[in-house]
Amino acid sequence: MASRKPMTAQAFLESRAADPAYQEMWLRKDAELAAFAAQFADEDRMISGEARALGYEISSVWDFVNNSPHSVLERNFVGPYEQAYPMLIRHLQIPHHRRIREGVIRALTVRDGREAVWQALLQEFNRETDNGLRWVLANALKIAMPYRQRVKFPEIARAYKSGGAL
């Protein structure tokens, strides 16, 4: 086996920048990602617009999910968003692209949502057929639903423990 000569990170990056096949691969990947995001961009804009009308400056439903301060990552939105819970509950009941639906569910994965939030999550959990989203809902219920209520529904624990692989 031939040994390779050590390469610095800078030299590696320069070699990738000069490699037309590598650059073509990244252009193709970027186009695929843009096409994927375009599938649900209108839905995300609709939710963001409704949130802005409530006073929350977000550009995506995922801004509610990733809303805690971070020392390195820049956050579009930081802070509580209780006034958005009713709007998010409404969107939970509207058919959305899977990526948006997951963002809505994760945005409702809150301890302070009270019964309105966990009842809506439970209703969707019982209705959901996608095992991956059932896991996301079970995770949300584990956070949002009081334990004394959650123990009445062993299927939540089963879905959570399955990791979405039921």
Give residue ranges: language-model regions.
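Residue-level detector of extended alpha-helical repeat arrays and alpha-solenoid scaffolds
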Residues: E57-V61, R101, R134, A165-L166
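Short secondary-structure capping micro-motifs at structural edges
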Residues: V61, V72-N76, M87-P95, I105-T109, ...
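Alpha-solenoid repeat junctions
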Residues: P69-Y81, L108-D112, L141-R148
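N-terminal alpha-helical scaffold/docking segments in eukaryotic complex subunits
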Residues: M1-A84
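Short inter-helical turns and helix N-cap capping residues of alpha-solenoid HEAT/ARM repeat scaffolds
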Residues: H96-H97, E128-D130, Y160-A165
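Hydrophobic core positions within HEAT/HEAT-like alpha-solenoid repeats
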Residues: V61-V65, I89, V104-I105, L122, ...
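Amphipathic alpha-helical scaffolding segments comprising HEAT/armadillo-like alpha-solenoid repeats
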Residues: R4-Q10, A34-E50, G79-I94, G113-R127, ...
